């Protein structure tokens, strides 16, 4: 059995093809050789390239089309604006319809879960089914839960409040309930402080006819669940995070939101102003929805999956837990089981 991959490059209603030739909207369409599927999935992320999404050949082998789709913000989350991303996703959905696809399944994987939910809530050409696969509830929520609240100077990666330092042995693990509550409140406070600064800085720059600027964000691998396995116990390796050992990752240059424009912060990361938060958008979803969560995920937790499931307005919604890691990369059997589960769910509704 041969799997075909077709490159798709298209302009967006809000952005034409670049002078060098690249299209703002790009991806790969995966199908079983010689077929024209009537049911297809589309998967998009805020900034990660999903053209070669791990699940694409598995779904294609089962007779579905799969469009791994990228917006203009692939690799450029520091410039993200939700309205433009929604327009770019719509280009992919319309292309699928033009190929004869009758049922479009929005696959929201990892950070893409809230993005696809926002698309479904706000776009004109909506999907017919929605799947949340090991998805974070929303972009502001995941950043806030991961950020290190012991940062006391956003311009200095070293400056630390020792009383809130999660890697200070005096704090834990194990972490006390009092420390956890104080820590979580301080994480929210950090997000709000950055939002206030971003709003004020944008006004200051605009007054000088400067439209925006980039700023760094330090230390975003500090969710206490990365360090203490007793907090929301699962089968995940702990201590650990997607970037390795949390104490080293948290001091390194790689992390979500590591650079951002002021407008991108307000559009994507802010707890106060972003429409990339899950619950408000999920509350507008009335199509059949499936929430799949793996039990050894190091960055998405059972409470996240339950929050997503509970927020979806549809009366046809299912929450399922499966063995495996975030991308089911730990086991071929886990990956096959996850794809079979989703494929069966789709077939039952098409």
For each predicted feature, which ranges?
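Catalytic histidine-centered segment of alpha/beta-hydrolase-like enzymes
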Residues: 324-337
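N-terminal cap/lid segment of alpha/beta-hydrolase-fold proteins
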Residues: 1-39, 331
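Short beta-strand/loop motif that positions the catalytic acidic residue
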Residues: 285, 291-293, 297
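Alpha/beta-hydrolase-fold enzymes
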Residues: 126-241
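Short alpha-helix in the alpha/beta-hydrolase fold that links the catalytic acid
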Residues: 56, 145-148, 287, 301-310
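Conserved alpha/beta-hydrolase
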Residues: 56-76
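Conserved alpha/beta-hydrolase "acid-adjacent" motif
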Residues: 51, 274, 298-304
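Alpha/beta-hydrolase active-site loop
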Residues: 79-99, 118
């Amino acid at each position: 059995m041969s799997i075909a991959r077709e490159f798709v490059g298209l302009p967006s209603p809000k952005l034409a093809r670049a002078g060098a030739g690249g299209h703002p909207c790009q991806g790969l369409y995966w199908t079983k050789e010689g077929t024209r599927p009537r049911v297809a999935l589309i998967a998009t992320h805020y900034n990660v390239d999903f053209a070669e999404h791990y699940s694409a050949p598995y779904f294609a082998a089962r007779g579905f089309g799969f469009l791994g789709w990228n917006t203009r913000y692939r690799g450029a989350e520091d410039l993200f604006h939700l309205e433009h991303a929604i327009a770019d996703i719509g280009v992919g959905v319309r292309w699928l319809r033009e190929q004869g696809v009758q049922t479009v399944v929005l696959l929201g994987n990892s950070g893409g879960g809230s993005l696809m939910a926002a698309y479904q809530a706000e776009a004109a050409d909506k999907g017919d089914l929605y799947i949340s696969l090991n998805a974070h509830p929303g972009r502001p929520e995941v950043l806030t839960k991961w950020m290190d609240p012991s940062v006391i100077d956003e311009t200095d990666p070293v400056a630390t409040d020792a009383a809130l330092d999660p890697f200070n042995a005096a704090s834990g693990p194990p972490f006390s309930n009092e420390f956890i509550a104080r820590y979580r409140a301080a994480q929210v406070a950090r997000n709000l402080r950055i939002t206030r600064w971003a709003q004020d800085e944008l006004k200051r720059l605009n007054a000088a006819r400067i439209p925006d600027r980039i700023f760094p964000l330090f230390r975003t691998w500090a969710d206490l669940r990365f360090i203490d396995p007793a907090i929301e116990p699962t089968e995940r390796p702990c201590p650990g995070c997607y970037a390795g050992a949390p104490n080293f990752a948290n001091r390194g240059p790689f992390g979500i939101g590591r650079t951002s424009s002021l407008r991108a912060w307000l559009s994507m990361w802010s707890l106060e102003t972003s429409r990339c938060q899950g619950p408000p958008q999920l509350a507008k979803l009335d199509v059949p929805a499936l929430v799949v969560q793996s039990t050894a995920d190091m960055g998405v937790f059972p409470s996240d999956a339950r929050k997503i499931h509970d927020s979806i307005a549809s009366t046809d919604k299912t929450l399922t837990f499966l063995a495996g890691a975030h991308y089911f990369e730990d086991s071929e059997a886990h990956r096959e089981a996850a794809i079979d589960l989703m494929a069966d769910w789709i077939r039952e509704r098409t």
